[in-house]
Amino acid sequence: MTSNIFKKVLARRLAVQALYQWQLNEQPIDKIIEEFKSSELYTNIDAEYFAYLLTNIDAKFEELKKTIENASDLSWNRIQPVEKGVILIGVLELQSGILDHHITINECVELSKHFGSEDGY
């Protein structure tokens, strides 16, 4: 049995993949969510949290992007899509206050290690 905490970890991982697809294919987020529901990995995640992350990042994208641009020395266009996904998840979680900031930061570091490039941000 998968713990609720691990289900959220897996939801974030799948969300990074979905955000990567969203950035490259520019599909509506609800279509991407539907596509990911057929993934074998989807059965092990916190599906509600996965949908929460994606729909809120989509709805608040310009606000989140502006926050990231204001806090970074890099322009948005220089950040790789995988790293953008991780950062978007982190900023959304930090702004929403749904998790302790220590948890969010740790989870984003782990996502970066898992998905990011060796020289990731």
For every predicted segment, state its role.
Residues 1-121:
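N-terminal interaction/assembly modules
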